[in-house]
Amino acid sequence: MADVPRLQKQYQDEVRPSLTDQFGYENPMEVPRLEKICVNRGVGEVSENQKALDQAVEEMRKITGQHPTIRRAKRSIASFDVREGMPVGVKVTLREARMYEFFDRLVTLALPNIRDFRGVPDRSFDGRGNYTLGIDEQIIFPEIDVDNVDRIDGMDITFVTDAETDEESYALLKGLGMPFVRRGDEEPAEA
C-alpha cells in the first residue's frame, strides 16, 4: 500500500477534530473535506504558435504530475480570432493522493517563491465553499526550469470542497496550511 500524503494524514488527525469542535458537527460525514483541485491554464496564442500549446501541456504535466486535457473553444469568436474546436487551454483535475501532494507543494514550495508574498487573499470564495486562486507566473513551481520557458503565463487553481459555507471552507483550507490574509490585514505596499 502506498504512503499516505502528509496533508491527508494532517487532515485526518488534526483538521477534522478541530472542525468538529469549532462548528459542532454531530455526524462525522458533516465535516467538510477537500474534494478536488482543478488547475486551469489558458493558451491564447495557439492560432499563431502550436508550440505554445505543447509547452503548456508539458509544463502542466510537470507541475501536477498528471497529463492535462486540452480545452477547446465551444463557439467561434471573431474578435479574438478563435474558431470553434480550436484549443484554448489546458486543464487538470486532481483528486485523492495527488491532490494532497499538489496542495502541499503549492503551500510549502511554490507560494513562498512569489516576490513580496504576504499571503493569499480571502476574497475569492464563491459563496458555496469553493476557493479560486490566480497565479501570475508558472515559474514559481520548482518543477519548471526558468531557462526553458518561452512565455510566462499564469493559471487558475480552484479548491473544491463539500463545505456548506465559505467560513467552513476557510477553516478547512486554513487548517491544511493555506496562508490566508484576512481583509484589512494586508500591509500597505511600500513605495
From Swiss-Prot:
Please give the biological process terms from Gene Ontology that the record holds.
translation
**Keywords, comma-separated and alphabetical:** Ribonucleoprotein, Ribosomal protein, RNA-binding, rRNA-binding, tRNA-binding
User: Any S-S bridges, and between which cysteines?
Assistant: none
The membrane spanning regions, by residue number, are none
Q: A single Gene Ontology molecular function, please?
A: tRNA binding
Q: Which domain of life is it from?
A: Bacteria
Query: According to its record, what are the GO cellular component terms?
Result: ribonucleoprotein complex; ribosome
The UniProt similarity line reads: Belongs to the universal ribosomal protein uL5 family.
Q: How does it assemble?
A: Part of the 50S ribosomal subunit; part of the 5S rRNA/L5/L18/L25 subcomplex. Contacts the 5S rRNA and the P site tRNA. Forms a bridge to the 30S subunit in the 70S ribosome.
In terms of PANTHER family, this protein maps to: 60S RIBOSOMAL PROTEIN L11-RELATED (PTHR11994)
- What protein name does the entry list? Large ribosomal subunit protein uL5
Q: What organism is listed for this UniProt entry?
A: Salinibacter ruber (strain DSM 13855 / M31)
